[in-house]
Amino acid sequence: MPLTKFLVYTPGDYFSQSCQTYNPFSGSLPRQPAIIPSPPLRNPIMTTNWHNGWWQGAVHCPSPNFSPRPAGETVSLVVLHNISLPPFEYGGSAIRDLFTNRINPQAHPFFPQLVDLRVSSHFLIERSGQVVQFVSGDDAAHHAGVSQYRGCSGCNTFSLGIELEGCDFEPFTEAQYQALIPLLHSMAAYYPIEAVTGHQHIAPGRKSDPGHFFDWPRLAAAGVVLAEGITD
């Protein structure tokens, strides 16, 4: 029987969350993502304005989960992820709560295992297209975990992380792409970004996001430089 990808966060996964594979619904078909309708599409704020690593086109929700970048380290990579909390459900404040250490373990049976995690991403793009920033781009967010890019391990130190609210099993929204592409261009104007990649590409076999449904060709057509080897 096919297995369902189910987000399982493990404290041993330094600076990140791990994704294990199993079927949580024995004897049933894989669970389909719960779809909560997104608000009407909104045009994201189009800006290249940054202040101390904070993008002025985002809602700012500071997280305590970050580390200073090593002296002399430059930001050269953007890593795309997906996340949904509770798993396969959209909307609500759980992702923001996770990244700010305010997750309520009583709110959902899945949440107790998240309470002691200290993870974050620089940005979250919600299904509506709302962009939320948690960590200054000048600092290292705790998003990539055990990872490697072009022979360099520990991608947190030289990357920016963007979480897209979603999962591996359905497309992202039009509003998310409308927000993501201007954000990527703004990042490239502010930082010496060399390429954009996925978590699945820097942690193969351990991670699968942003997943099969992410539209890499759309990014390439918009002039975003993708990491070598990304074709779809």
Describe each region flagged by the PLM.
Residues 7, 14-15, 20, 26:
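Short hydrophobic targeting helices and cationic amphipathic motifs
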Residues 12, 37, 41-153:
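N-terminal catalytic cores of peptidoglycan-degrading enzymes
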